[in-house]
Amino acid sequence: MKSLAGHVVKYGKHRERRSFARISEVLELPNLIEIQTDSYQWFLDEGLGEMFEDILPIDDFNGNLSLEFVDYELKEPKYTVAEARAHDANYSAPLHVTLRLTNRETGEIKAQEVFFGDFPLMTEQGTFIINGAERVIVSQLVRSPGVYFHGKVDKNGKEGFGSTVIPNRGAWLEMETSAKDISYVRIDRTRKIPLTVLVRALGFGSDDTIFEIFGDSETLRNTVEKDLHKNASDSRTEEGLKDVYERLRPGEPKTADSSRNLLNARFFDPKRYDLANVGRYKVNKKLDLKTRLLNLTLAETLVDPETGEIIVEKGTVLTHQVMETLAPFIDNGLNSVTYYPSEDGVVTDPMTVQVIKVFSPKDPEREVNVIGNGYPESAVKTVRPADIIASMSYFLNLMEGIGNVDDIDHLGNRRIRSVGELLQNQFRIGLARMERVVRERMSIQDTETLTPQQLINIRPVVASIKEFFGSSQLSQFMDQTNPLGELTHKRRLSALGPGGLTRDRAGYEVRDVHYSHYGRMCPIETPEGPNIGLINSLSSYAKVNKFGFIETPYRRVDRETGRVTDQIDYLTADIEDHYIVAQANSPLNEDGTFAQDVVMARAQSENLEVSIDKVDYMDVSPKQVVAVATACIPFLENDDSNRALMGANMQRQAVPLINPQAPWVGTGMEYKSAHDSGAALLCKHDGVVEFVDASEIRVRRDNGALDKYAVTKFRRSNSGTSYNQRPIVHLGEKVEKGDTLADGPSMEQGEMALGQNVLVGFMTWEGYNYEDAIIMSRRLVKDDVYTSIHIEEYESEARDTKLGPEEITREIPNVGEDALKDLDEMGIIRIGAEVQDGDLLVGKVTPKGVTELSAEERLLHAIFGEKAREVRDTSLRVPHGGGGIVHDVKIFTREAGDELSPGVNMLVRVYIVQKRKIHEGDKMAGRHGNKGVVSRIMPEEDMPFLPDGTPIDIMLNPLGVPSRMNIGQVLELHLGMAARQLGIHVATPVFDGASDEDVWETVREAGMASDAKTILYDGRTGEPFDGRVSVGVMYMIKLAHMVDDKLHARSIGPYSLVTQQPLGGKAQFGGQRFGEMEVWALEAYGAAYTLQEILTYKSDDVVGRVKTYEAIVKGEPIPKPGVPESFRVLVKELQSLGLDMRVLDIKDSEIQLRDMDDQDDDLITVNALTKFAEQQTAKELEKKAAEQVEDERQDIIQNFETAEDNLD
C-alpha cells in the first residue's frame, strides 16, 4: 500500500495531528511570554539595585552628611492575585530599603530599614493587577543610543553629511556640513558653531594641534578659516569656551569658567549624561577601527610597539585576512597617541586615541587619519573627549569616502525597552525627585538626632510608579477577548509612547517592512489604520538580548565540512548583516550537508542564489519569520499579505464559544500558543491526579506533597467575555510539569480553539451573500454551535453628598411593589434573577436639594423631624440591551474593612450574564481575512444538501475569493473535507505545509471526487443545482463585533446643553443624525411636513417638543412648531458680534425669540415620561401637603388661642 501523505505528530497528551511538515524542528519554540517575565525578573534582581546605586549616596551641601544604600528587599504581598482582583486592589509587595546615614564630623553611623511604598508585582501570566484590572506593559521600540551618521542633500543638490551622538539621556551632539564645505556642530539643538570651536574648547587650542590630530582635509581648512582668533587677550581655548557658552546661554555674561562648568555638566557628569551600557557598546562598535579600516590602503607601516617587528607594510590593502592578523594588535592599543589638553580646557585628563594613516579612496595620493576612540570600558557611561574626537574623525572621513552612513530603520539601530527598563526609568525619576527633598532636609534638620527615616520622603517615588502603571501610554488595559489576544498583547512592540514617535510625525520609512525584520518582527501582523507599522509583533522565535536588541536563532554551517550543524546562534540584525543565511527549506542530505550545489539565501537586503561554500548560517524554521497569530493561519503562503494581516488581527477578536472545537486543519501552533497564553491551568510539579471536579484539581507530587489548583469558573474577562476553565485530566492520571490540567476559554484538549469546523459551500443564493454576507443554517443556532457567554459588570456606589448620605434601600419613591419583587431587604437584586432592560438592580435614594423652607414648613420640620425631607430615586437599572441573568453580586462596605475611595460608604457590583446565540448582523470570519456579516439564518431543510443528504452549514460568496487573492481558504476547505471524511486532525505549518499534491493526495485517500467538488441539491425543491460546487470544512470564528452591542434606537433621551439637539451615539442613548444630505433627500421628495417635524419637535424646538408630548399623552391635536433652538443660538451669536439681527414674520413684525432664564432649566433637560409622572404625583402631593398644613395650622392656632386664654 502507498504510504499516506504526512506523518503523525503528538501535541500535548491529548491530541494527535497528521503533519505535512517536511522540515524537522531543530529548536523548540521559546516560552512565548518570556519577553515580559524575564525583563521583570531582571528588574527585581538587578535593575532596582542599579537605580539606588545610581542616585545614592546623597551628600549634603557641606559634605558632612552622607546617605548610603545598603540593600533592599521585597516582603510578602498583601493580597494574592485573586484577592487583589476581588478587592479592586493592586497585586503588589512592600519594598523595604536599608539605608546608612554617616555623619563625617562625628563619625557616627546610623543604619535603618525604610519602607519605600508598595511595588506592583507581575503575575505568572506576565500581567499586572492594578485596581483589580489586569494590565499589560507593552514593550517599546526606540532608537538606540549611539553615534549615527547620515547623508543629506541641500536645496542646491549638493551632497553633505551629518552625524548625531544620541545618549540614553542628556544633550545631543550633532555635526553637519554646510554648502560652503564648512563643518559645524550643534549642542542640544541650539545654534550651530564651527566644529573647531568645540575642539578648542576641549583644550586643543592651536590650529597646528587640530591639524596634527585630524590630518589635513579641505573641510577642516575651510572650518579653521571661518573660526578666527577674534580676541587676542583670550587664549584660543578660552575663546572657544566663550563661543560655546554664547550659543548655549545666549544673552548671559560669558566667562570661560561658567562655560567649562556648563560643558562639564552637559556631557561629562554621569548624573546628567548617560549613554547606558547599550550606548557605550554602540559607540565603541561604530568607532571601531577594525571595521572602519576594512578594504583601505595603509599609508604607514604598522610596527609592534613591544618587539619592534613589522606587522603590516605600508601600501597593503587591509582585507579580511590581513585584518585578522592586525585585530589583536588594534585591541591592545596599536598606534595609540596621547594628547594633553591645555589646563584651561573642559577636561584636563590626557586623552588617548588610536590614529592610523590610510590613503584616501577618492585621491590615492592623499593621506587621511582614521582615529579610534581607544575603546573605553563599558563602565564609562558618559561620552569622553576621545569619543567626540573619534566621531568627528569618522565624520570627516565620510567626505573622503571612508566609512558608511547608518539606516535608522535598521533593527541594529532600534532597540526594545521592555517592562523592566521602562519601570527602571520611571523609578529613577521618582528617586531623583526624592533626592532633592533629602538634600534640603539634611541642611534644615538637626544633625545630631537625624535618622534615614526622617530624611526620606517616599511620596515622589510612589507617585511616579503609580503614574506609570495608571496613565502611561505603554501601560494598557489587557485585551482579553480570547487567549490569543492576550498572548499577542504581551508580545506587542510599540514605537509610540514617551521617548518614541508620534503618529503624525511618523513617515512611511519607519512604518515599512525592513529586511532586518526577518525573524525578529512579523511583517504581517500590525493594525490597519493610523498605527500601521508603528505597532508590531515579536516573531515566534525571537529573543531580546541584554542590550535590548532583538535576536533571531540560526543554525551554524560548518565551513570546513559544509554540514549544517545543530549549533544554534542568536544573531542581532547588525551582526547578521555580515553573513549569508540560507533559507529553512533548503533541502539537506541525511548527514546534514546541502543536497544541492546552489541554494536560495539572504545577504542583507538581497535574495540571492549562492553556492553552498559561501553559506554561513541557515534558518531554524520556516515560521521564524512570522508572529504567533500569523503562524496560526494554515496555507498562509497562498494568501495575499493584506488579507493575511486581517486574518491575524481578526483571530484576536474571536469570542470564546460554549463548546469550542480545535481546527481540523491547524498549523501545529495551536497547542503552544494556548499553553503559553496564561489562560490554561498548568501543572507545576510531576505527580498523579488525586481529585478532579469542576472547581478544584489536586495533584499528589512524587515526594508526597499535595498541590491544589483552583479552576476558574465564569469569570468576567477584561473584554466582557466569560473566562471559564474545564478540567481535561482524569482521576489517577500521571501528569508532568507543564502539562495542561484544564482548558481555558477558547481551548479544546489543550489546543487553541477560537471557532468551529463547519460545512461550507461556495455558492450564491438568492443574492443573500452579496458583498461578503454569510448565509447560515438554523442548525448552528439550535445546536448552540456559535453560542457564547458574556458577562457585564454594573456598579452603584452610595456616597456622602452635601445634603446627607445616599442610602441603598428597598424603599424607593414612586416605584410599585411589582418592580421590587427580586430585591432583597437591602434593596439589592438576588442572584439568579432574570432581568430585562430597565429593571432595578440596586435601589438607591439620594437626598433632594431642600429649597428655602417657609415658616410653616420649618415649624413642621421641627415637629415631625426628617419626614418632610424629599429624596429622589437614583437606583441602578439595567441599561438597554443589558438584560440577562444575575450571576453574582459583590458588596463592599467600610465596616467590612474594604478599601473604598473617599466619600463612598458602600459599593455594590452586579454581574449579569447573557447567553448570545448567533444572530443576523453578527460578524464572522475565516482565518484568511475572509470576513462577512450573517445576512440570513435559514431553516435546515431549506439549505442546499450533499448527495448523502447532509445539509451544508454556511454558504459563502465565491466572488469574495479571486479579487482578494486569499486562496488559502479554498485549500483549507478541501483539506478540511478530507480530514472530516478520514476523521483526523491535520497540521499544515506555515511555509512548510501541505503542498498542492499533498492536498489532492489526501482528497483521494478520503474517497472524494477528483476535483473535490460535489453536486448540491436545492433544499426547497430537491432539484440539483447546475454546476458542481466546492464544499468542504472551513474553520469559521464569531467575532466580538456582535449586533446585540450595536443595535440601538432612541425613545426619549438627553439633549445637548447649547444647541438643545439630541445627543448622538449608543452610549449617550442618542439619536440618529439627520444631516444635510438627508434634508436634501426629503426636499427632493417634497415631504415638507415630515421635514418640518424632524427639524423642530424631534430635534431642538424646546417648547414645541414638551407641548407635543403633553398633547400625545392627553390625546389632543399637536400644536404648531416654534423656532428651533439652534436658530436662536445662531441669532444670538451674530448679535454678540455686534450685528443688529432681528427675525421678522411675513408681515414684517418682529418675532420674539425666548430668552433663557432660570425657570427653563427643567424644560431643557426634559425627560418627559418621568417628568410627566413626577408632575402628576407632585400636584397630588402638593394638594395633600397643603391640606395637611392647613389642618396643622388650624390646630396650632387653636392651641395658641387656648394657651393665651389660659394665660389670661
Swiss-Prot record:
<comment type="subunit">
    <text>The RNAP catalytic core consists of 2 alpha, 1 beta, 1 beta' and 1 omega subunit. When a sigma factor is associated with the core the holoenzyme is formed, which can initiate transcription.</text>
</comment>
<dbReference type="InterPro" id="IPR007120">
    <property type="entry name" value="DNA-dir_RNAP_su2_dom"/>
</dbReference>
<keyword id="KW-0808">Transferase</keyword>
<dbReference type="GO" id="GO:0032549">
    <property type="term" value="F:ribonucleoside binding"/>
</dbReference>
<dbReference type="InterPro" id="IPR015712">
    <property type="entry name" value="DNA-dir_RNA_pol_su2"/>
</dbReference>
<keyword id="KW-0240">DNA-directed RNA polymerase</keyword>
<dbReference type="Pfam" id="PF04565">
    <property type="entry name" value="RNA_pol_Rpb2_3"/>
</dbReference>
<dbReference type="InterPro" id="IPR014724">
    <property type="entry name" value="RNA_pol_RPB2_OB-fold"/>
</dbReference>
<dbReference type="InterPro" id="IPR007642">
    <property type="entry name" value="RNA_pol_Rpb2_2"/>
</dbReference>
<dbReference type="InterPro" id="IPR042107">
    <property type="entry name" value="DNA-dir_RNA_pol_bsu_ext_1_sf"/>
</dbReference>
<dbReference type="Pfam" id="PF00562">
    <property type="entry name" value="RNA_pol_Rpb2_6"/>
</dbReference>
<dbReference type="InterPro" id="IPR007645">
    <property type="entry name" value="RNA_pol_Rpb2_3"/>
</dbReference>
<protein>
    <recommendedName>
        <fullName>DNA-directed RNA polymerase subunit beta</fullName>
        <ecNumber>2.7.7.6</ecNumber>
    </recommendedName>
</protein>
<dbReference type="InterPro" id="IPR010243">
    <property type="entry name" value="RNA_pol_bsu_bac"/>
</dbReference>
<dbReference type="Pfam" id="PF04560">
    <property type="entry name" value="RNA_pol_Rpb2_7"/>
</dbReference>
<dbReference type="InterPro" id="IPR037033">
    <property type="entry name" value="DNA-dir_RNAP_su2_hyb_sf"/>
</dbReference>
<dbReference type="GO" id="GO:0006351">
    <property type="term" value="P:DNA-templated transcription"/>
</dbReference>
<keyword id="KW-0804">Transcription</keyword>
<dbReference type="InterPro" id="IPR019462">
    <property type="entry name" value="DNA-dir_RNA_pol_bsu_external_1"/>
</dbReference>
<keyword id="KW-0548">Nucleotidyltransferase</keyword>
<dbReference type="Pfam" id="PF04561">
    <property type="entry name" value="RNA_pol_Rpb2_2"/>
</dbReference>
<comment type="function">
    <text>DNA-dependent RNA polymerase catalyzes the transcription of DNA into RNA using the four ribonucleoside triphosphates as substrates.</text>
</comment>
<dbReference type="GO" id="GO:0003677">
    <property type="term" value="F:DNA binding"/>
</dbReference>
<dbReference type="GO" id="GO:0003899">
    <property type="term" value="F:DNA-directed RNA polymerase activity"/>
</dbReference>
<dbReference type="InterPro" id="IPR007641">
    <property type="entry name" value="RNA_pol_Rpb2_7"/>
</dbReference>
<dbReference type="Pfam" id="PF04563">
    <property type="entry name" value="RNA_pol_Rpb2_1"/>
</dbReference>
<dbReference type="Pfam" id="PF10385">
    <property type="entry name" value="RNA_pol_Rpb2_45"/>
</dbReference>
<dbReference type="GO" id="GO:0000428">
    <property type="term" value="C:DNA-directed RNA polymerase complex"/>
</dbReference>
<dbReference type="InterPro" id="IPR007644">
    <property type="entry name" value="RNA_pol_bsu_protrusion"/>
</dbReference>
<dbReference type="InterPro" id="IPR037034">
    <property type="entry name" value="RNA_pol_Rpb2_2_sf"/>
</dbReference>
<comment type="similarity">
    <text>Belongs to the RNA polymerase beta chain family.</text>
</comment>
<dbReference type="InterPro" id="IPR007121">
    <property type="entry name" value="RNA_pol_bsu_CS"/>
</dbReference>
